[in-house]
Amino acid sequence: MLQRLPALALVQLTICLALSLGQPVRADEARPNPWPTGSSPGLTALAKAAEQNRYAYVFFWKTEGEATQRKRETFDAALATLGDRADAISVCVSDPEEKATVDAFKVSRAPMPLVLAIAPNGAVTKAWPLDFQAATAGDGIVSDGAASCMKALQGNKMVLLSVQNSLTSHAGEALEAAAGFLADPRFAQAAEGIVLDPADPAEATFLASLKVSPTTDKAMTVLLAPPGNPVATFVGAVSTAAIVAKVTDAKSGCCPDGKCGPGQCCPGGKCGPSQKSSAKGVSK
């Protein structure tokens, strides 16, 4: 399962990973800069970091004071340990000039100070409300594959993750099935396709969290639903129909007729594209 951000709808992003003609894209492909420049100092700084393919750690604060100063010193010291991998950005949420930044991350009511780690593609990869620890600063830097999946999931989209390379069998069939699913009008706007090389050492930790071996000799296709729950894993050859059936089964099992009733849950606690977004999760 992907790491879940703290239960703050405040840090949800609604930015989508671009697809080309319904085809899955490689996690390491260059992407458009997700941030506008000139709308606020914070977003301009984020755009600069993304342009240089660097992470950004944003220190959100509200009022000056001894406590804020101590937290800022801890933040600065922690960022120094990350070297040139990340830029440090400070945003005062009460500054009118930073309204666009505050609105982008929906942090106006978040407990302060708040630190967010943001990948070059715009995904929030880690959040530290109130208590940022230098020892865990590096946890915000994740692989390209993890960041790509997080970005799509934070946009409330499903992810169809194709794990394959030139050595895995059935790669062509699996990729064709994924492309067919992503081209289906029922899912085209509700899913993202991402391709990962299982032998990429940078993706080892992420793939291990999904129980995918880096030495797999068969293509693997993993379906993820927000906030990061694996719904299904297909090994080797798979068809578009099989993927659609798994999604349909997951939807119909918790939302009969595409409508989420009281006490019903959908994969990841969220309904699919044809379902109501107000579904409540069932308490265990």
Predicted regions, residues:
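Bacterial N-terminal signal peptides
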Residues: A9-S20
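Thiol-based oxidoreductase modules, predominantly thioredoxin-like and allied folds used
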Residues: F60, G83-K99, F187-A204
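N-terminal secretory signal peptides that target proteins for export/translocation
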Residues: M1-A7
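N-terminal leader/targeting and pre-domain segments
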Residues: A27-R54, A134-N156, K246-K284
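Non-catalytic, surface beta->alpha helical segment in thiol-disulfide oxidoreductase systems
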Residues: L114-A146, L224-P256
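Local sequence-structure signature of Cys/Sec-based thiol-disulfide redox active-site neighborhoods
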Residues: T44-A78, K151-R186
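Structural micro-motif
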Residues: R54-Y57, K99-A117, K157-L160, A204-P226, ...
